[in-house]
Amino acid sequence: MLSKLNKKIERVFKEEPKEVNCKEYVDHMDIHQPFVCVGYKMDACKTKAEAFEKDFAVNMWLDSIMGPLNPKFQEWLDQRIFTQFVGAEADFTLDHSYILFYAQTVNPNAFIELVNELVQNKSISDEDYQSLHAQAIANNLRGLDHFDGLANDLLRSHFEEYDYIENLNSIQNMKIEQVHAYIKDLDFSHSCVTKILPNDSI
């Protein structure tokens, strides 16, 4: 159907604001232990290449600070700052970006304080980089042997207009200096804390 406006019709998206919509949200559910999530709103990326590389670099850093690679991880478990349900993840795209730290914990405030301390350490050790980088390359190579997954990845890259093989190469060629550059660029000033607490009846 032709447009009566005689003009090209385009989808218009409002620019994502830098500020979070709400700094704290608390809800109650039928659970036995609280859940907490500390989210940080990040600037959207300017190019697809930047989004892919930054996503990989930041998630590598998160694996090094919020996981068994961190020597203090077992100590935090013993102190019950969090349970086995704990993690961190990041997503960087052209229209939005964020970093999340989440956990099940009997002491949400202690977890929040821990996260606030962790994000001040914007670095990754050479040992952690070597380990996580080698693991990522190995996972990519194994992925090339799973043809169903490979077909889906190639199809997705076609529709999202990026080069799948080029992205794999960018991971293989990424140096620790690039990882540090992306980490140092992070701005943690826009945060939101979400708490899911047990109902009084539990």
Each predicted region: which residue ranges?
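A common structural junction motif
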Residues: 1-9, 117-126
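An aromatic/glycine/proline-enriched structural segment found at the starts
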Residues: 1-45, 199-202
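M16 family metallopeptidases and their MPP-like homologs
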Residues: 35-45, 51, 73-122, 128-174, ...
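A conserved active-site cap/scaffold subdomain adjacent to cofactor or substrate pockets
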Residues: 31-37, 43-69
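Generic recognition of flexible, low-complexity loop/linker segments
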Residues: 25, 87-89, 180-183
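Bilobed periplasmic-binding protein-like "clamshell/Venus-flytrap" ligand-binding domains
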Residues: 180-182, 186-192
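Hydrophobic alpha-helical transmembrane segments of multi-pass membrane proteins
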Residues: 5-6, 57, 61, 101, ...
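Active-site-proximal alpha-helical segments within enzyme catalytic domains
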Residues: 1, 111-116, 182-185
